[in-house]
A protein has these predicted regions:
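Short acidic/polar hinge/loop motifs at secondary-structure boundaries
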Residues: 118-154
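N-terminal periplasmic accessory domains that precede
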Residues: 73-76, 98-101, 113, 137-140, ...
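N-terminal periplasmic "start-of-domain" segments of outer-membrane beta-barrel proteins
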Residues: 38-70, 99, 124-132
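Repeated loop/turn-to-beta-strand initiation elements of outer-membrane beta-barrel proteins
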Residues: 181, 214-218, 266-271, 330-336, ...
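Extracytoplasmic beta-strand/coil segments of soluble accessory domains associated
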Residues: 74-121
Length: 486
């Protein structure tokens, strides 16, 4: 009897111990599940929250596949609300070189980014008296096949990017590196029904894969695309005997490479290099009043130049870009450091600088201007829980531009080149700015983003730019968005 009691007690003790172990194990597993759930929490930064605000649009790679770009992504971006092209500007000048214009504030107030990095090659082109440049802009340095998405920000949503983005921002995001070898080749052609309109074709490739799996990866893409110029007589003669020039032809050659090094779980280093060449095919545009380029007996004094230039390449842009980016993911937040250098060589024939002949070609000899831009940027995002859940963003940037231009600082006429009194062939400017943004989770239905940016320019002085964006959910089906910025 005593032995049976002892065995029963021992059995109960074992069962109890097993039950306790099972309960303890359940507690441990439950705790692990909770910890895993907490690790999956996503903190939305002010930048990402603003992209959900009023005035933000996203174009995906699927959208670009459904309606392929013929030559320039501006053809697709113009479909977004508030976006137009400068061919419909008030002056109508340089209408055959159309640039992205957001909210009617002109291309000078539209900032073009590639993977968040500004592109400003168009600044190497002479700025006309009426605020137009003879340029295609900076929206065609990345082939459509290499694009993952395009972000279009308008109004208050673009305030964090400063005065150059008063109209808005177009951020072209390229495809990321992959841990498996992937590649693609794209061939595209567009043949218009009207034989006087220029046809287009594009050939591009994209290749990505690992060098050391999970550690070092690469991406390489290249592109060649060409759109022929319209015929010189595509538009009818006016009563005054002038004729509007057709669409200028364009030829693009681009190649870009990326090396991505995953240093460890917290840090990564990315090296980007790209080289591009853009050239035109002249159609007779002379900015203010186009003569009939098909009439060799025109009374216009410079028509001989125009006739001699038809179908030729009158301007060529070369762009080299190098960027090194370090990203860190730490227990307290995220950091991003960027060093970038861009060089643009703008090779074109001289033009008259003032009066009626402004923008008219006057020589067959091309001149070259050079724009060098050096940029350093630092940004950190820190999640906080002080009174309200929030994500604080702190950033600073320093930019230096050096411009060498012997063409736009001389007066060109039929008799030759006359140097202006002041020497502005070499110019230099510096801008430094800092910004603070905070994304507050006021309630489950209310998000508030406050921001302020301070700019200091070596030529134009200082400026403060505050901004506010708010998103309010109204039930399951409606959301109210608003914003204000200066």
């Amino acid at each position: 009897m005593g032995k049976n009691l002892t065995r029963s007690t021992l059995a109960l003790a074992v069962v109890g111990a097993m039950s306790s172990f099972a309960m303890a194990n359940d507690v441990v597993e439950t705790t692990k599940e909770k910890e895993a759930t907490q690790l999956q929490t996503i903190v939305l930064t002010a930048e990402e929250q603003v992209k959900q605000s009023l005035g933000a649009s996203i174009i995906t790679d699927k959208d670009l596949e459904k309606l392929p770009v013929v030559n320039d992504i501006s053809e697709y971006v113009r479909r977004m609300p508030g976006v137009n092209l400068t061919g419909n500007s008030a002056t109508g000048q340089r209408g055959n070189n159309r640039q992205i214009d957001i909210r009617g504030m002109g291309p000078e107030n539209t900032l073009i980014l590639v993977d968040g990095k500004p592109v400003n090659s168009r600044n190497s082109v002479r700025y006309g008296w009426r605020g137009e440049r003879d340029t295609r802009g900076d929206s065609n340095w990345v082939p459509a096949d290499a694009i993952e998405s395009i972000e279009v920000l308008r109004g208050p949503a673009a305030a964090r990017y400063g005065s150059g983005a008063m109209g808005g921002v177009v951020n072209i995001k390229t495809k990321k590196v992959t841990n498996e070898v992937h590649g693609s080749v794209e061939v595209f052609t567009n043949q218009p029904e009207n034989s006087k309109e220029g046809s287009s074709h594009r050939e591009s490739f994209n290749l990505s894969g690992p060098i050391i799996k999970e550690v070092l990866s690469y991406r390489l893409y290249g592109n060649y695309n060409k759109t022929d110029a319209d015929a010189a007589d595509i538009n009818p003669l006016t009563e005054s005997g002038s004729r509007a020039a057709g669409r200028e032809g364009v030829e693009n050659k681009d190649i870009s490479g990326r090396l991505a090094w995953q240093i460890n779980d917290q840090q990564s280093l990315t090296l980007d290099t790209s080289f591009g060449r853009q050239g035109n095919e002249y159609t007779g545009d002379i900015q203010n009043s186009n003569a009939d380029a098909t009439n060799p007996d025109s009374s216009f004094s410079n028509i001989a130049y125009v006739n001699g230039l038809l179908g030729k390449e009158t301007n060529t842009m070369y762009r080299d870009s190098y960027a090194l980016t370090h990203e860190g993911k730490w227990a307290w937040g995220d950091t991003k450091l960027l060093a970038q250098f861009d060089k643009t060589k703008n090779k074109r024939i001289p033009e008259s600088l003032a009066g009626g002949p402004e923008g008219s070609p006057n020589s067959f000899d091309k001149k070259t201007s050079v724009l060098d831009t050096t940029r350093f940027n630092a940004e950190t995002n820190v999640p906080l829980d002080i009174f309200l859940p929030q994500a604080l963003t702190l950033g600073a940037e320093w930019v230096e531009d050096k411009f060498s231009d012997a063409t736009s600082t001389v007066q060109a006429d039929a008799s030759g080149l006359v140097q202006l009194p002041s020497d502005r062939t070499h110019m230099k400017s510096r801008i430094a700015f800092a910004y603070i943004e905070d994304n507050f989770k006021v309630t489950d239905a209310t998000d508030l983003v406050l921001g302020v940016r301070f700019d200091d320019h070596s030529k134009s002085g200082s400026n403060w730019s505050p901004s506010l964006n708010i998103t309010q959910k109204l039930g399951d089906y409606f959301t109210l968005k608003g914003g204000i910025a200066r």
